[in-house]
């Protein structure tokens, strides 16, 4: 074991010399402990509290047991090991910094029955991880990232609030059930997990940015405010119901939801960016926005719908593009009524090939730079089969480009 600071209380040879007989808890203090083997870890077996971080970066260990340690005030990071099959955090109840498991190709199980609080939980590129045991339940984590695992459930992760939640490229994950989650301050992304995945967030009230991609079942009945953008992409949802949302700070978009037949946003009053619906062939009517008054960006609807009902809409600061194949469509807007403030005004039916606005085309690299790895398309380092699938690439690319436009235009709507 190596200590990374010149100032420390003990070395690997005398770790127990500072433990005073009968004193509880036994506290070990050094900014960072670098471990490579179970023997290195055993040196800390008399420490109940580690005031610092424990890091394993490359190792050939096949299993790790953290024995008597109960609290780590810094980070616990285990990564870059092709042999490690199991990790037991038997007594650990709290990790003040980040708990990270990353690039552990054989890791099959994580056992942490007492763990309740972490600063940040990251589980990335663990292609054989099928089991996690968080028996007590993780109730606090500022950031949660679950990416490229074989987990089928996130049972044992039961947050009340968090800053960021990213759950992507877990091909066996069939449910994201967070019954007590009430707020996500920054980002909530669920993308490219099992096709039949169910996302249940019955108490969620506020969120920053939210992207729901390739989801089969969704529960957002209590959602009241989205501070950033809200997007539903490539899902098999038949009904999307957010009956209590009153405000969306940036864009709202529905793209590639081929089985979608109904929308319910009956309390929504304002959208701070673009409002887009595209590639949703089963959506025959666009309605369910009884109180929508203002759209700070543009309206861009394309599809097969026969009607658009926005009865309270009075102000669209951007342009209008409504194109449908239906011959029964009658445009609900007139350029002379003053509702549409932008320069572009397209609103017609019987269109053979409805097209989105020209502004929807952006370079794919620009999109990746904006949203980063592991949000819509997954991480560059991901081993997930989804990333390698040609079908997935063909299916998702145009929608990723459109999403870039939506996020960008929400900040520049006044220029349209």
Swiss-Prot record:
Keyword Secreted: yes
Family matches, as InterPro entries: CWI-Assembly_Regulator, Rcpt_L-dom_sf
Keywords for the protein's UniProt record, in alphabetical order: Cell wall, Cytoplasm, Glycoprotein, Meiosis, Secreted, Signal, Sporulation
Glycosylation, residue list: 51, 57, 160, 234, 244, 304, 373, 381
Subcellular location: Cytoplasm; Secreted, Cell wall; Spore wall
Gene Ontology cellular component annotations, sorted alphabetically: ascospore wall; cytoplasm; extracellular region; prospore membrane
Biological process (GO), any one: ascospore wall biogenesis
Chief place where the protein resides: cytoplasm
Signal peptide: 1-29
Described function: Required for the formation of the mature spore wall, where it is needed to ensure correct localization of 1,3-beta-glucan.
Protein name, as recorded: Meiotic expression up-regulated protein 10
Organism name: Schizosaccharomyces pombe (strain 972 / ATCC 24843)
Lineage: Eukaryota, Fungi, Dikarya, Ascomycota, Taphrinomycotina
Gene name of the record: meu10
């Amino acid at each position: 074991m190596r200590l990374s600071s010149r100032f420390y209380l003990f070395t690997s040879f005398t770790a127990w010399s500072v433990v005073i007989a009968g004193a509880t808890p036994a506290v070990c203090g050094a900014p960072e402990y670098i471990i490579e083997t179970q023997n290195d870890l055993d040196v800390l077996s008399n420490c109940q509290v580690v005031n610092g971080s424990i890091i394993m970066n490359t190792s050939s260990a096949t299993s790790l047991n953290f024995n008597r340690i109960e609290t780590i005030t810094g980070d616990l990071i285990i990564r870059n090991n092709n042999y490690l099959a199991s990790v037991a955090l038997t007594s650990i109840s709290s990790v003040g910094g980040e708990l990270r498991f990353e690039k552990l190709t054989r890791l099959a199980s994580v056992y942490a029955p007492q763990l309740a609080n972490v600063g940040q939980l990251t589980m990335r590129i663990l292609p054989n991880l099928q089991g996690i045991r968080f028996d007590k339940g993780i109730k606090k984590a500022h950031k949660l990232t679950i990416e490229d695992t074989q987990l089928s459930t996130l049972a044992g992760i039961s947050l009340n609030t968090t800053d960021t939640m990213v759950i992507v490229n877990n091909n066996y994950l069939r449910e994201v059930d967070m019954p007590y989650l009430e707020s996500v301050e920054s980002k909530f992304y669920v993308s490219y997990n099992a096709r039949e995945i169910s996302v249940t967030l019955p108490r969620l009230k506020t969120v920053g940015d939210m992207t729901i991609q390739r989801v089969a079942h969704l529960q957002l009945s209590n959602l009241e405010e989205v501070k950033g953008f809200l997007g539903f992409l490539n899902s098999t949802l038949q009904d999307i119901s957010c009956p209590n949302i009153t405000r969306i700070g940036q864009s709202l978009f529905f793209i590639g939801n081929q089985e979608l037949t109904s929308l319910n946003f009956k309390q929504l009053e304002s959208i701070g960016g673009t409002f887009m619906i595209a590639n949703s062939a089963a959506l025959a009517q666009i309605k369910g926005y009884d109180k929508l008054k203002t759209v700070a960006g543009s309206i861009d609807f394309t599809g097969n719908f026969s009607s658009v009902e926005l009865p309270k809409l009075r102000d669209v600061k951007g342009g209008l593009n409504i194109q449908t194949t239906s011959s029964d469509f009658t445009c609900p807007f007139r350029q002379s009524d003053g509702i549409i403030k932008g320069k572009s005004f397209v609103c017609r039916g019987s269109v053979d090939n409805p097209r989105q606005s020209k502004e929807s085309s952006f370079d794919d690299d620009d999109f990746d730079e904006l949203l980063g790895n592991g949000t819509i398309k997954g991480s560059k380092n991901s081993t997930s089969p989804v990333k390698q699938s040609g079908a997935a690439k063909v299916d998702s690319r145009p929608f990723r480009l459109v999403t870039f436009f939506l996020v960008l235009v929400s900040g520049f709507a006044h220029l349209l």
